[in-house]
């Protein structure tokens, strides 16, 4: 199993895991800006607000992966605003696919499921960044010829996602009552990190 941060081009590092007693599986949490690729039978867990996750799987190779990202805001000069969001989104997808290929997956056999993009930051942000994230993932997968087998996107609620890597099964729980601001604070912090991301070519596309 490998993990990385989609802002970096460095090699992926081992990801801490825990045992999920409910599902009786090894599990790991995927935070905003991270991705995980694995050939082990395990549970990938993430909580999504306006961010999106793409669950990818090559069932023949028993290799799966999940990312958790949003597109940067276009709060920059007009030239950068026209190119940076797409460049970052492509990187978030390509780095996951590349790590899966290293584990034996074949890009031509991959299938996708997409989740998230809820309008959970309404009242904080003027634009619906969740809708923009979903549009990007759909367009990217269509262009790459990766079929989307299922999706649960948009709406106004955060989601907790459980991706069973070996079977490809996904359980989604919509969080209609939020008891603390952890989800929102993580996303706003991630958004600020993206706004400060350098535009000097440090994003590597495979």
UniProtKB/Swiss-Prot annotation:
HAMAP family: CheD. This is Probable chemoreceptor glutamine deamidase CheD. Belongs to the CheD family. The lineage of its organism: Bacteria, Pseudomonadati, Pseudomonadota, Betaproteobacteria, Neisseriales. One of its GO terms (molecular function) is protein-glutamine glutaminase activity. Its EC number is 3.5.1.44. It catalyses: L-glutaminyl-[protein] + H2O = L-glutamyl-[protein] + NH4(+). Signal peptide: none annotated. It holds the Pfam family CheD. InterPro entries: CheD-like_sf, Chemorcpt_Glu_NH3ase_CheD, Cytotoxic_necrot_fac-like_cat. The keyword Hydrolase applies. Probably deamidates glutamine residues to glutamate on methyl-accepting chemotaxis receptors (MCPs), playing an important role in chemotaxis. GO terms for biological process: chemotaxis. The keyword Nuclease does not apply. Keywords: Chemotaxis, Hydrolase.
């Amino acid at each position: 199993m490998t993990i990385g941060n989609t802002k970096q081009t460095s090699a992926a590092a081992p990801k801490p895991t825990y045992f999920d007693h409910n599902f009786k599986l090894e599990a790991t949490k995927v935070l905003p800006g991270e991705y995980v690729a694995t050939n082990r039978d395990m549970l990938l867990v993430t909580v999504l607000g306006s961010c999106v996750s793409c669950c990818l799987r090559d069932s023949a190779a028993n290799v799966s992966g999940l990312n958790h990202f949003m597109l940067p805001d276009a709060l920059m000069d007009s030239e950068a605003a026209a190119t940076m969001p797409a460049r970052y989104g492509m990187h978030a997808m390509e780095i996951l696919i590349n790590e899966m290929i290293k584990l034996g997956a074949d890009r031509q056999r991959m299938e996708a499921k997409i989740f998230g993009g809820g309008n959970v930051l309404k009242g904080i942000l003027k634009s619906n960044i969740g809708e923009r994230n979903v549009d990007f993932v759909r367009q990217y997968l269509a262009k790459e010829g990766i079929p989307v087998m299922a999706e649960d996107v948009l709406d106004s609620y955060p989601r907790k996602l459980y991706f069973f890597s070996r079977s490809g099964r996904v359980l989604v729980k919509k969080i209609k009552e939020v008891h603390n601001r952890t989800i929102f604070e993580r996303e706003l912090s991630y958004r600020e990190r993206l706004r400060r991301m350098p535009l000097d070519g440090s994003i590597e596309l495979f």
